[in-house]
Amino acid sequence: MKLTVILAVLIGTFVLGCSSTAPAPNATAIPEPTPIPTATAVPEPTTVPIATAVPAPTLLPAATVVPTPTHVPNPLSVNIHPTSCSSPEIGISKKWVETLESANFTKCVRPFGVLIGAADGIPDVYIAQAAKIAAEILDPDMDGEPNDSTVFQLVSDYTTAWIPMPTDRNSWISGGVEDELGQKLRSYGLQLPQWWMIGDTEFGDLNPDQYAKAVMVEEIIHFMTQFGYSRAYPEIFGVESWNSLIAKETKRASCDWWQHPENDCPNNPRLYGDCSDPDCDVTEFYHQVLVTKAGMEPGWLGIGFPTTPEELDLKLSPALKAAMEQPKYNQINKPLVFSYPNRAVTVR
């Protein structure tokens, strides 16, 4: 009993002790952290599109510059009668007049601006015939206007090329007159000399015969091809390389049905000289093609060259025939009449 009381007292004391324990102080409240202001959103930079690389342009070969005719009188005289080179009708510079006269080239004519300058001994009728041929090639319908304005501009620039008609072979070649004129005038002279037209004879009082006309046609076509059509349409009529249509045709025909006597072929060497460059071989070949196809007879024929239009037609490639027959190229397609009328017109 006593033990029970003691235990009860102890238990009560323990309970009181526990109940008298001071309550634990509340934990200091940790303040909520001051919110850090949200940074202003920096917008994503606008995406700059990457520029598409522009490839460098492919360099194309520079087109041949078409020169403006120099000193072409207006209205342009299509007068086919020769006159003094100093005449206003001719319209060449004073330097040219003086240089020509110093070499005894005193007579000139300019059909559609093409300068033909003749030595004093060339009869007027020969000069006039050459002028008529040049005019008819440029204006085959003879309406007073050149059919191809681009070719007209090219061949009427006498500071690039002209047609001299010398009389004395010795002074022209051996005496250096040809070279001297070339150096002073800086223009290519595609010659139409007396000795090619009539040989070593004298002119007399007769008009040019068929052979003399054929020589005129050949040299004037050479002139028109080399300084006109070749530069206006180099991909078709070019004679400066072997890349044009007529140059490739020349190569195709070479040593088959065409050989210039100054060029070599297997088992048939050249007779003299050298005409292997395109500006010679192609020019010579195309003259014979053009003249024969138009129904005329060349002054001479290359070795193996067809003698009739029908034979030639069987030899020519379809591509060349098609090009020659296109109206825009204004190639002669019928025999010349050799009688271009005298007139003066304004060429635009």
Where in the sequence are the language-model features?
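Bacterial N-terminal signal peptides
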Residues: L7-V15
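Positively charged n-region of N-terminal signal peptides that target proteins for export
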Residues: M1-V5
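Acidic/His-rich structured neighborhood in mature extracellular/periplasmic domains
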Residues: S102-N104, P111-W257
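Ser/Thr-rich, Proline-interspersed low-complexity disordered segments
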Residues: G17-L76, T83
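Conserved aromatic-histidine-acidic binding/catalytic patches
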Residues: A118-I122, D205-A212, L271-T283, G302-L312
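A domain-level signal for the mature, folded cores of soluble proteins
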Residues: P73-R110, G144, A253-Q259
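Post-HExxH zinc-binding segment in Zn-dependent metallohydrolases
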Residues: G228-G302
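Pan-zinc metallopeptidase signature
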Residues: V289-R348
